[in-house]
Amino acid sequence: LPKDQIEQILPFNAMSVFLLENSLFDVAVNLDKEAEACVLMAKVEAREKYGYTWEDHAVAPCTSAAEHKLMTGFFDQLSKVNTKSYLQEIFEICHASFNFEPYAIRLNQEKYTHWQTILDEKREGKQVVGLNTGCGPRWNTRLWKDEYWVELAKTLREHGYYPMFLGGELEHAKNVALSEKAGVYYPGHFDLETFISLTNTCDIVVTQVTMMMHIATALQKKMVLMNTIFNPHEFELYGRGVIIGPPSPCQCYYGNECVRGTSCMNDIDPQTVYNGLNSIA
C-alpha cells in the first residue's frame, strides 16, 4: 500500500508488539505464515480475524477460508493443481470476492514527467519496451541469459520498438554491458520511487517473476511475463499481458537450483518472447 494511504506504520520491535497486544481492532488481517507474525496475530485482540494465527505451537488458519492457501504452501502437489490467482486467494482469505480491483501504487508525478520528457525525445514516436533483467540473488532459476537479452533488444529495435534496459543496483554492471552490446538505452539504477516513475514511461514491460511484475501490474502496463518455477494460474495480468514458459514443464518447482543442471529459463528463446510481446503491442 502507498504510505500516504496508511494511517500508522509501526516498526517490528518490542514496543510495537506491546502496543498491539494491548489494542482492540475491528478487523485484523495477517497474510504472513511466518511464526512471529502468526504469534502476534494470536495475541492481538480483534472482533474479526482473517488470515493466519498461532494455535497449538504452530501456524493455523483464522477461518476455514484460509485453509486452501495454507495447504498449497505445505504441499507442492496441491499447489501445482491450483487454478486460483494470488489475488483471488487473498480476497477469499479475507471473506471477500475479487472483482479485478486494481493495485494501489504511489506515482511521483514530477519524476514521471521528467523521465517522460527524456523518453519522448529518444523514442521518436516508437513504443517503449522496458527490459527488466534482474531477479535478485535469491532466485537464480529465474535469470535469463545475457545473450538472450541482447538478441531480444536487437530484434525489438529492428522491428520498430524502442527497448530500454531496466534493473536495480545488483544489475547495474550487467545492464551497462548489455546496453553496449545491444546498442540500447540504459538510464541507470535509482531508488524505488524513481524506478516506478521510470517504469511508467514504458508501453510494454518484459520481466521475470520479480517486484517489477507487481510494479508493471500496478501501473497497468502491458507485460510479457517469463515464468518457469511457479504455477502460471497464480498470476493475474488483468488481460494486459502474456505468460511465456519453457516448451517442456519446469521440474524446479519453487526451487532456487535447477534439478537438471541447466535452467529451463534457457529454453525460453528470444523469438518466442518477441512473438508474445508483438501479440499484445
Predicted features and spans:
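Catalytic machinery of carbohydrate-active enzymes
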Residues: 1-281
